Amino acid sequence: MADDLARPVFRVPDAPLKDRLPHVRPRYALPALRQHLEMFPVVMLQGPRGAGKTTLAQQVAKSKIDFSNRTDVELFEINPKGLLENAAKPVLIDEWQINPSSLWHIKHLVDEGLGGFIVAGSAGHYEPDSAHSRFPLVGRCSILRVPVLSWAEQNALLPQPLAEGLLAGDMSWAQPQELDHTGYLAIAMSTG
């Protein structure tokens, strides 16, 4: 256990995203996550299980505390404030619902002026408003909903900005596709 205390919290290597996470598809939510992190000390990712909340967060996180990892749980139990304070920011707190008290520790650090927390897990929807006054991050976090992959995301067809594409002569986005009813049904089924 003493050796575990010397273990650094998971750090993301300083390599390009395509090298670190080659399987990751571009997501519409990525620019929104970056923007929310600039504006709020905490961003809570919400969405169905398997929607890609953790994968999305790992694209911007510099460190990670994963409550599905027993070592991270033990380290958190020993020194929650130190672990959260010293983690490189932004830090992903993954599977927070396993340890809901972690939100109270984050609240106290935010109240001390610290930010850069991404909270993800599969725990239903918690709204940071006055109707949920027991929610510790009321007024301190932003909720970013992460839907399942869209058809465009599944096929890596995220468009470039329209004006940029038009100036470059790229009209590929305007090419019609012939789909019958089973094709449309297949798209609908694959995107939730």
Predicted feature residues:
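Phosphate-binding site recognition
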Residues: 1-192
